[in-house]
Amino acid sequence: MLGFAKKLFGSSNERKVKTLATRVAKINAYEAEYAALSDEALKGKTAEFKARLEKGETLDDILNEAFAVVREASKRVLGMRHFDVQMVGGMVLHFSGISEMRTGEGKTLVATLPTYLNALEGKGVHVITVNDYLARRDADWMGQVYNFLGLSYGVIVNGLSQGERQRAYRSDITYGTNNEFGFDYLRDNLVYSVDEMVQRGHNFAIVDEVDSILIDEARTPLIISGPTEDRSSFYKTIDVLVKELILDKSMFDHDEKQKQVILTEDGQEKIEEILMSGGHLAEDSAGLYDAANVSVVHHVNQALRANILYTRDKDYIVKGGEVVLIDEFTGRMMTGRRLSEGLHQAIEAKEGADIQPENQTLASVTIQNYFRLYKKLSGMTGTASTEAQEFDDIYKMSVSEIPTNRTIQRIDDDDEVYRTEREKNEAILKQIADCHVRGQPILVGTVSIEKSEELSKLLSTFSFEKDGKKVKGIPHQVLNARFHEQEAVIVADAGVPGAVTIATNMAGRGTDIQLGGSIDMRLFNWRQQQRGMGLEITVEDEAEERARLETEIADKKAQALAAGGLFVLGTERHESRRIDNQLRGRTGRQGDPGRSKFFLSCEDDLLRIFAGERLDAIMRTFGVQEGEAITHKWLNNAIATAQKRVEQRNYEIRKNLLKYDDVVNDQRKAVFEQRQEFMESSDLSDIIHEMRRDVIDDLVLRHLPPKAYAEQWDVEGLTERVKSILGLDLPIAEWAAEEGIADEEMKERITKAADEYAAQREVIITPEQMRSVEKSFLLQMIDLQWREHLMHLDHLRNVIGLRGYGQRDPLNEYKTEAFSLFEKLLGDLRTNTTRWLMTVEIAYAEPEVPHTPLDNLVEVHLDPLTGENAAFAGGIPEGLSTAQREALPVSALPEGWDRTNRNAPCPCGSGKKFKQCHGSLVR
């Protein structure tokens, strides 16, 4: 019935796109009129639109004209005209949706439409990309259109000063990575002056590669942290003990499907015995699970996880003595990102690497809750429909599949499933050799560094026939986390006839494989070659070389097309269908032909864990011989079903984590908003006075209960607390002995004495100085209390799941206890602020507020595209002073770079001129 209705009325996506398509005709109606305008008249439209908005019109009212203006400006400035389907994509973004557009359909150009329209309000538009390079490239490229139309743009990248960030955020349009925007938000809530804040609100955001950022990054919070006590020696000790323990597999249970490992009863007894004999358990403790040994149990569990669940060259690599995580979705190194709760230190101990100290969280926010700060949020990607439910549930964004400008010519073959990995690899090698001989470029996708290097070794020794001769070794390139520095060169040649490229998951890479090769990269290499020979490059020389290369690349493209276009070969299915679709999407761009096929085996992780035994039994039943594969539509459906189950499980995990984080998020917003009010206020004396009154009320209520007799009062306790918190030595015992004295009168006397003492202390310095001291104390105290609160919440989150065994809902328990902890935070804030201001000796000096309020801050910062810490480029830290740069030798640059023309693009691929990038390092 549902299928019939869909045929009759069309899917909801088709209806939505059809509705928006009718509006495109109205936009197109302005094209001839605007084409006839002079440049000045076209630029004047921006001021006209702003004036109309001020008079009460809405963005929706001027959408048709604004989109038409951007299209015309783009034609004049970039020589690029928005297709009608791109107009539809732009409208989806404006209406807070997700535009699913295929590879090569021009998402970057589409973003200019809603960006310009929403920037007219003057509240700022943020365009989020996955790395600094793309942020710079897109800003400089599309910024030409914005500048032409009278709007300003800025770029937020790693290494900018506070002033540069402020200027970028005050632009009409700001480009940057999700990490930079998120960390700026956190840093803004750690500074002590409004003048130090850089962001100006969260109005409208367009997220490129939205599935990568809002789904893949959803379980990883952005964290700013500071160092704590060094326990590296204990990690090493526990690792040695656990390594010895797990030699006997009966000591632990390992659940691959749930990714869990726990000690068996025998294992618990054995490790307890070892720890006890080594003197690692607390004295007089009842055993390993005594409350006094909680920390030891935690170390044992993390060492167990490190040794059993985490595999070298799959989950992480060791590079330069450092353990670097690998993103399971992109295959990228995640330099700068560390596992929490001591797990990263446990892996470092396992590998004998330098153990970095643990860090205490100072401020954190999940990607989900950061982006939910925006009043309006939209996104673009090539693959979002498989996660449509999650986008709708969590972000309230619907996914719209935008039709391609040209019909997709790609053929997706059924999967081939073999019994063993060896048989599968043999079939893969034959397929690669066939493509190579026929001149068809092939991209081979693997799920890990380990797999890509294994396949590379097999290709190097594989023998095949070419031109009637026996040849050993298929020439190929490997692109994985180890060699990502060579990515631009490798991807540029991946579309050349006969090219073989092995790559770990290509998700989120922003790469566009062009059949025949990339003319830009070929030109760049030619320039480098000419300069290396000391030759001067003229405009005529470059134009001549470009024409020659265009002809050569056109010929090579024709050869690749004749061979069938780019062949994408998947060596395993990923847990997520979206990652598989991203790999497939690398071929068949802009109407080019292409082919994709997955080669699987019953020993692959996905099939082995979820369907391995059943599938192997079926193959035996049907008498599948060695080297034979089974291929069938029902098999594809069965694999897709397994993937859906995993996706649903992962979604439930993310959704569950979000429920817990929402509890923290409500508290975070309350604290950050209160902190903001404190910073913006020039006089907090009323708040300080109110806090002091509340503290006195609490003290009297606790020690002099309202319905108790005077004889039952804790007079001694109240006297001590008043002295320690208020700095007052009052005759409270004498007051309590008075006939008919009541708790209210006691409260009034203490309050009066406290007010008088506070007034006396104000005389020590001027009122203005006192206000400054109060503000400084209050901000420092709220930061201190918030850090401790986050630590308590982390501990609570780690143990709250055990409440489920007592038939209690862990989430409700967490909400209740988190609220109690928050109330304690507020009480401690009042008490400690009052104690500081009433007891600390005041000696005022003009404060020198540093840009960063805390030393030794660590940003857990991932660049999803390059995988490297963006603070470093080519091994040279960005943001060096002139003196520091002058102290660097020319040899600090990679070999040959010092001969680069100063006005040429920098070889590092940043998009900047050489003199503005690595050239600035040369004296």
Swiss-Prot record:
It comes from the Bacteria. GO terms for biological process: intracellular protein transmembrane transport; protein import; protein targeting; protein transport by the Sec complex. InterPro entries: Helicase_ATP-bd (IPR014001), Helicase_C-like (IPR001650), P-loop_NTPase (IPR027417), SEC_C_motif (IPR004027), SecA (IPR000185), SecA_CS (IPR020937), SecA_DEAD (IPR011115), SecA_motor_DEAD (IPR014018). Its cofactor is Zn(2+). It catalyses: ATP + H2O + cellular proteinSide 1 = ADP + phosphate + cellular proteinSide 2. Keywords: ATP-binding, Cell inner membrane, Cell membrane, Cytoplasm, Membrane, Metal-binding, Nucleotide-binding, Protein transport, Translocase, Translocation, Transport, Zinc. Its main location: membrane. The keyword Cytoplasm applies. Its EC number is 7.4.2.8. It is an enzyme of class 7 (translocase). Part of the Sec protein translocase complex. Interacts with the SecYEG preprotein conducting channel. Has a central role in coupling the hydrolysis of ATP to the transfer of proteins into and across the cell membrane, serving both as a receptor for the preprotein-SecB complex and as an ATP-driven molecular motor driving the stepwise translocation of polypeptide chains across the membrane. This is Protein translocase subunit SecA.
